[in-house]
A protein has these predicted regions:
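Short hydrophobic beta-strand motif reused across regulatory alpha/beta modules
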Residues: 407, 510-518, 577-585
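The conserved cystathionine-beta-synthase
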Residues: 479-496, 503-504, 522-525, 543-570, ...
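Short beta-to-alpha loop/turn elements within the nucleotide-binding domains of ABC transporters
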Residues: 466, 483, 513, 530, ...
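Acidic/proline- and glycine-rich, intrinsically disordered low-complexity segments
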Residues: 469, 528-533
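Alpha-helical transmembrane segments and immediately membrane-proximal extracytoplasmic
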Residues: 1-465, 469-470, 474-475, 479-491, ...
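Short, solvent-exposed cationic patches
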Residues: 532-542, 597-606
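Flexible loop/coil segments at beta-strand boundaries within sensory signal-transduction domains
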Residues: 505-508, 571-575
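Short, intrinsically disordered terminal tails adjacent to the first/last structured region
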Residues: 1-12, 570-571, 599-606
């Protein structure tokens, strides 16, 4: 064989092979490669974050209810009041001074960042939310891990996107990836974690988003398995549908779960409103909430020696699944948990609503099951079956997320025996709750802030993404109440404005003064010896908060007709931060259009 011609032969064949069209194809284009790698990184980060967060809660819980409570044995059960109050003493200042978006249950804050800020979340949220929520849960706060880990994972995804200087659309996707990974790792539920991110956060099921989110969820779940092993959140006995007639009972329970879910949502925000009226410093409110929570804990402690309304309450849920709780206990714990959760979050605590929703759903279902079983003992399954279905039905009604509710219960329990009643009750609950209230517990919080989620999720409204803080004029000419009208006339002449904000000595907004009133007095020749306070025409003007979208200011301008809308602090003090005029809104809108065009151009290049 002549080997001397081998190099030429190889070269000839290589040229022929390289000429084939398929060699010019790529398995992944640049965009897909970027999303694959970044979603993998976010999955690793959120998985590790979820493991650390869970271990931090366990460590703090042991510190609080073993070490500290052990030192207070002679004061039992007063330690149930002191420990939640101590937790509140840490949570309040931590949230108020370092990251106020860490207050509450977390998911609405993520949705707000996706809608208003292109998914950009401050890096400090990772640390503050981790500490605040772990302290709150460990000290007895009636909240869950789902909201915090969703926000923590989302913040990690946002950080990755910002560091790599990705476009807004990609940052949003990575935020959803982080949330999916956090939930998957926390609850051993990768499918539900991915669906939660798509159904609740992104509100769309596009193939591009689905692939990235699933990669993050699976990666995070693998990380959690490596450190903590493969274990179900809840153990359940074997349940089955005893009779087709039971489906009618499950349908009725789904309706009741929907009404209870809507009631919970409204009571939660009613509690927030009531706490906002209490005139004490904001950082101290969680202390008061902790004291009141402790009183509820003592009530539940008297039943069987355990404060079942504290924390996530998974042990109590599992007891209800095995039908180990009496009718009186399930009904009593339903009411106590409702009060405990609204107290914790209303007073400024930090934690999610998923675990409390499962708890209340289990207690509602257990109560319904006890009653149904006592009436139809031969044909109705034990109360534990109704508790299991009630968990999904209640959360579906609260979050308006039936697919997530069904899947997460499957993955947390591993029980597929009563799939029909579970799906039926959850869908019925979601339909009824949507008819009673158009907003879920997440979107209602945003609506109260003036944030309306875009109906067309494929093209997010640019005006929705521009906040008052981004657009406002901070260097506005604010005038004092005691300013002489002659001086006010000079101020109007130099600024060419038709209305100016009036402030008190402490910089709080007193109202608006317009040039119309000043012109009337000038024509009458009575400007001398009079002050702004004498002609203050608009004493209670419509205002806007820094985090609210500027389209709200446009609406106020139309209603008020005074030419400017004051921007005031969120603390309730009405401290003037700036003003919004039509020209400010137009400038900010033009800037947003330009940035969106640059992002689209950047995507086309990649």
């Amino acid at each position: 064989m002549n080997f001397s011609s081998l190099p030429k032969t190889i070269s000839r064949y290589w040229k022929q092979i390289s000429s084939f069209e398929f060699t010019r194809l790529r398995l992944l284009d640049a965009d897909s490669s970027v999303m694959l790698l970044t979603s993998l990184i976010v999955g690793i980060c959120s998985g590790v974050g979820a493991v650390l967060f869970r271990n931090l809660i366990d460590w703090l819980q042991n510190l609080a209810y073993q070490d500290i409570s052990g030192l207070m044995q002679e004061y039992y059960p007063l330690h149930l009041i002191l420990i939640p109050a101590i937790g509140g003493a840490f949570v309040g200042p931590l949230v108020y001074y370092f990251a106020r978006e860490a207050k509450g249950h977390g998911v609405p804050e993520v949705m707000e960042s996706l809608e208003l800020r292109g998914g950009r979340i401050r890096p400090r949220v990772v640390v503050v939310k981790s500490l605040a929520s772990s302290i709150c849960i460990a000290s007895g706060g009636s909240v869950g891990r789902e909201g915090p880990i969703a926000q923590i994972g989302s913040a990690l995804g946002s950080i990755v996107g910002q560091v790599l200087k990705l476009s807004e659309d990609r940052v949003r996707t990575l935020v959803a990836c982080g949330a999916a990974g956090g939930i998957a790792a926390t609850f051993n539920a990768p499918i539900a974690g991915a669906v939660f991110a798509l159904e609740v956060l992104l509100r769309r099921f596009g193939s591009v988003y689905f692939g990235a989110v699933v990669i993050s969820a699976v990666t995070a779940d693998v990380i959690a398995h490596y450190f903590e092993g493969d274990q179900r959140t809840f153990l359940t006995p074997d349940y089955a549908l005893n009779s087709p007639w039971e489906l009618l009972l499950y349908t009725l329970m789904g309706m009741l779960a929907a009404l209870a879910a809507v009631g919970f949502s409204r009571l939660l925000y009613f509690s927030e409103d009531m706490w906002s009226l209490i005139r004490v410093p904001e950082p101290t409110k969680p202390i008061l909430g902790g004291i009141m929570l402790g009183v509820l804990g003592i009530f539940s402690f008297q039943v069987d020696g355990f404060p079942r309304v504290f924390g996530v309450g998974y042990d109590t849920i599992e007891s209800s699944l095995f039908s180990q709780l009496t009718l009186q206990m399930t009904f009593g714990l339903l009411l106590l948990k409702l009060l405990a959760t609204t107290l914790t979050l209303g007073s400024g605590g930090s934690g999610g609503i998923f675990a409390p929703s499962l708890f209340m759903g289990a207690m509602l279902g257990g109560t319904f099951g006890h009653i149904a079983h006592s009436i139809f003992p031969e044909t109705v399954a034990p109360s534990g079956a109704y508790a299991l279905v009630g968990m999904a039905a209640f959360f579906g009604g609260v979050a308006h997320a039936p697919i997530t509710a069904i899947l997460i219960l499957f993955e947390m329990t591993g029980d597929y025996q009563i799939i029909l009643p579970l799906m039926l009750a959850t869908v019925v609950s979601t339909i009824v709750s949507r008819n009673v209230s158009r907003d879920s517990i997440y979107t209602l919080k945003l609506k109260r802030r003036g944030v309306v989620l875009s109906q067309d999720t494929q093209a997010i409204d640019l005006m929705q993404g521009v906040t008052a803080e981004m657009a406002m004029n901070r260097e506005t000419e604010a005038v004092q109440l005691d300013m002489q009208l002659v001086e006010l006339m000079s101020t109007f002449s130099s600024t060419h404005y038709h209305a100016l904000p009036v402030i008190k000595q402490n910089s709080e907004l007193a109202g608006l003064v317009t040039i119309k009133e000043l012109d009337l007095l000038r024509i009458q020749g009575s400007l001398e010896s009079k002050t702004v306070a004498d002609i203050l025409s608009v004493k209670d003007p419509q205002t806007i908060l820094p985090n609210q979208p500027v389209w709200m200011a446009l609406r106020h301008l139309e209603d008020q007709g005074e030419g400017c809308v004051p921007v005031v602090a969120e603390t309730g003090s009405k401290k003037l931060l700036g003003v919004l005029r039509r020209i400010d809104i137009i400038r900010s809108y033009n800037k947003a259009v330009s940035e969106r065009a640059q992002d689209q151009h950047h995507d086309e290049i990649l």
